[in-house]
Structure formats: C-alpha cells, structure tokens
Amino acid sequence: MLDKKQWDDFRASSRSPYHYWGEDAAQSGAQYIVELGGRSIGKSYFWRALMLNDWFLNGAKMAYIRRYGEDITPAKVAQYFAGVDWGKLTDGRFDGVVCKAGQITAVKRDDKRKVIDSALVGYYFAIALDEHYKSSDYPEVQWAIFEEFVTRGRYLPDESDRLQNLISTIVRDNACTCVMIGNTITRACPYFAEWSLTHVPRMVAGDVDIYHVGDTVIRVDMCAAAMDAPKKSSKMFFGKSKKMVAQNEWHSDTFAKCPVNPYAESRVLHTIYFNDANITMRVEVRRSDYGDAFVWVTPVDFKFTRLDKVRVVSRQLTSLSPYHQSTFRPLCPAEGFILTAVEQGKIYYCDNLTGTDFNTIFLTLCTTPKLK
C-alpha cells in the first residue's frame, strides 16, 4: 500500500475533480471492496491507477479477473491497459505493456521495437477457468480487480464461492485486497444475496456500507463523482441510459403498460413467487374481464420458510416440498402460460425497474428462458 508521501504524489498527479476518488475505500482495510456506480465516473480508472502506482513504487503485483475465458484474451487484456501512460507512470523506464501466457508485463522498446527492459506487473485470470490455476504460484500479488462483476446475463454456477477459491489460489495465506467493479445495470446479482449485502438494492450515490462476514470485511460503495462534471457532457446518452451513465441511478428498461387495471378489471388464476439475490417477485397469472389472460409482476417483501405452502422458485430455499423449486419448471398449465406470456409480450410490470429486475431473475432461474 502507498505511504503518505506516495498518496500525496498520486493524488496530485492523478486526481480529477470530476471523477470518483476511492482513497477512503483503499485505506479502509476491507478484504473485499465492492464499487458500484454509473459507467462514466472513473471507478476503473482510479483503481487501475492505484494498483499500478503501488506496483511501480512498492512492487505489489495485481491480479486482473474476469468471468469468462473469452474476456481475458491477450488482446483484450492489453486493451484494458491501453489508456495507461506508462512513460509518465514509470518515469520513463517503460513505455508499454505485453500480455501473454497469463502475465501482464511492462516493457521498454528501442527504436526498432525490440524489448530492452521488462518487469512483471501481475497476472490475469478467468473464474470459469479456475481449475487451470491450481498448484501454480503467483508471488507478491497484493491486489485483485474483478471487472464487470454485475451482469444482466448468466452467472457461473456457485460463482461467488469460485471467486473466493480463485483468490485463495492466487494469494494463498498472504494479505490481499479484492476490488469488485460493477455498473448499476441490475439489482438482481447473486453476490448481494450470497454475501448478505442486504442493503445494496436501496443504496444511492454516496452511500457506504460495511459488512462483517466472519473475519472478512466487505465494504460496498455506491460511487459518486467528486463534483458535477462541466456542462460539456456527452450528448450521446438520453432517457433511461442517461440516468444510469450520467446520473448514477439503477438502470431500467422500458416495458409496455398493462392494457387494463390489473386489480379492478381482472382476477387471479394462479400465483407463484420468484426469489433471487434478495429480491422477490410475485407473479400472477390473471384473466381480464374482457377474456384475455396475462401475467402481472410486482415486487414483495416476503420471507419464505421451508414449511410455507406457497409456490416458490428460489436457489436460496432448500426443501423437499413439491411447492418449491430451485429452477423454474412449470407444474401446471397456468405456469406454462408464463413462458408463453414472456414470448408473446403478455407480461406486464408495476414499474420499469421491476421489469428489469424480473428479467434478470427469470433468466437465472428458468431452464429455458426466452426473454425479449
């Protein structure tokens, strides 16, 4: 970790008044630092710059982590470091980076592009390839950065446990800080539930939560820029995308409004609950007074037990009850209609954020999702 003078120099050379600055988080002593926020506030910039400064000044190696193997090709890893001014960072000792065979190496080239000096910066890993890294040695790794850990696509099976096992493989019994960078694209993320980060869905810009899980400290920051950016901000973002990119709000898609009043002009035929990542959705198959069937989705604050005789799909609920499933498999025609409703656009939500969360949850819990 940087000492006081190194922090002063780093702050003077790198800090922008318009972007996120995570010095408090870096000095918090947490083993896991979860950084959430919009795409344009500088989360990755700060942490990458900090880790590279700590490497050059103190020899601290870093581990760059992604979810899938296709995300850590040498070209993609090199692109991640493409914006680094290696000459400025290293006082002219190095001028570029080479990524191959799982290693990130700073290099100095002569006029003929021949490498004349090099130094190991760190390593890169994919959680999906975790079995490949066992029995290998990665000395002096003190930082790990997991980029884009929040996704609207599929997570790996037991991903949060596999991440911890990968960190254990990398650092063994040594001290390490793992920084997890995520954009506010969905609140339905298994890490939030499995690590009991219960307040994350309700966090707003500037909030900081500290969780203690056994001997491990997890710090969660809903990152905010230091101050409002100048009015020359990009005109390429508008609507819901601007709220997430520029205004640091949870992203939500836009969905069709229910053509009838679901409570005054329809009746419930069947109810099922979907639960994942600390979010529960009540899904009702309804028939309108005009004859058409549709699906109505609302969020609920409901805690299930193994004894509840309600229809529940949840990975967190282990039970032998026929009412409970860990993945959604229709048990009756009404539940089969839910799949049809998704395909035909006959599913409606009480608000857009509910629809966004349900799409992520349904994709996770359904064996054959066909969301549009």
What are these regions (language model features)?
Residues 2-372:
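Phosphate/NTP-binding elements of NTP-utilizing enzymes
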